[in-house]
């Protein structure tokens, strides 16, 4: 459960991220595909090379969904309900991939904003990303 302090920390981080959705999202996906190659199986139709327009576009969607979750941090489940349905029922993405994506996103934030990602903020952002992953996995049950 996200505390009031966690919510404040997450919102603070996302003020730094909002203008970089496409770049940070693409970097997160590229990092995930390289670090966890089996995740590429969900994107057989994508050009997975660095700088790919498809990766940039999807990365922007990923970070856009995270921003939507931040904007509705008290109702993440409601904010991401349609996305949860899509991933569970149509795309059938293995839920473990949400955790992997979250880890890669944390690394990207740490690279670009090291002074913001204090241990306390890191813990809050990790809790938030786990909450998002849990919401996206909920419809699998």
UniProtKB/Swiss-Prot annotation:
One Pfam family matching this protein: Globin
Secreted as UniProt keyword: no
Binding site for O2: 58
Positions with a binding annotation for heme b: 87
Tissue: Red blood cells.
InterPro entries: Globin, Globin-like_sf, Globin/Proto, Hemoglobin_a-typ, Hemoglobin_oxygen_transport, Hemoglobin_pi
GO cellular component: blood microparticle; haptoglobin-hemoglobin complex; hemoglobin complex
PROSITE patterns: GLOBIN
Record GO biological process: hydrogen peroxide catabolic process
MF terms (GO), sorted A to Z: haptoglobin binding; heme binding; iron ion binding; organic acid binding; oxygen binding; oxygen carrier activity; peroxidase activity
Family annotation (SUPFAM superfamilies): Globin-like
Keyword set, alphabetical order: Heme, Iron, Metal-binding, Oxygen transport, Transport
Keyword ATP-binding belongs to the record: no
Chain ranges of the Globin domain: 1-141
Residue stretches in coiled coil: none
Subunit structure: Heterotetramer of two alpha chains and two beta chains.
Similarity remark: Belongs to the globin family.
Function in brief: Involved in oxygen transport from the lung to the various peripheral tissues.
Protein name: Hemoglobin subunit alpha-A
Organism placement in taxonomy: Eukaryota, Metazoa, Chordata, Craniata, Vertebrata
